[in-house]
Amino acid sequence: MKKVFLLPAILLLGISGIAQKWTKEYMHVNEIACGLSLVEKDGKHGYVNKEGKLIIPLIYDEGMNFVEGRAGVMVANKWGFIDSTGIEFVRPQYSEVYSFNEGMAAVAKGESWGFIDEKGNLIIPMNYTNARCFSGGLAPVCNSKGLWGYIDRQGKTVLAFQYGYADRFRDGTAKVMKSGKWIYIDPLGKVVKEGDE
C-alpha cells in the first residue's frame, strides 16, 4: 500500500521542483489565469504557460491577469488589451483599464470613463469620472458631481446617482456609501443590511 502513495508523492515533488526552477527566472510570477501566468523580468512583462514556456514575449511595461481570455497590457504609459495568443485587439490608448467582466471592460482616457466590448468597440461613452466592472448586469459609475449610481449594459441608469461610493455586486449585493454610512443593497437598490465599517 505504501508504494501506491509513494509514487504520487514523488511525481508531485518532481512537478513542483520543475515549476520552482522556471519561476526563479522571473522577478515576479502571478497565479495562472486562463492558462497563462503574468511574469516580470528586467522590468518587462509577458506571459508563460503552466510549464513555464514563454507564450507572450516580455515586451510590456505592465500587465494584468487574463480574465475572459483577455488581458490589459501597458506600453509607454498607455493601456490596451491582448488575447491569449498575444494578439493586440485594443491598441494601447487608455490611461486606465479594468479587466473584462461580463464581456465588457471599463476604460479611461484622462478623467473620463466608459466601456468597451470584447472587440474593443466603445459601447458606453466616456461620460463618467470613474467606473468599476460589470457584475450581475450592472456597473457602478461616478458622475461629474462625485455621486455613484449603477448602469446596465446599454448604459441606461438603473440605480440613481445618490451614493458617495458604490462597489460592484457580489452574490447579489453591493456595498455602497449613503449619507456617510456603509450599507449593502440589492440590484433594485433596496437596503438588505447595514454596513460593517
Predicted features by range, described:
Residues M1-K21:
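Bacterial Sec-dependent N-terminal signal peptides
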Residues Q20-E197:
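Residue-level detector of conserved, function-critical positions
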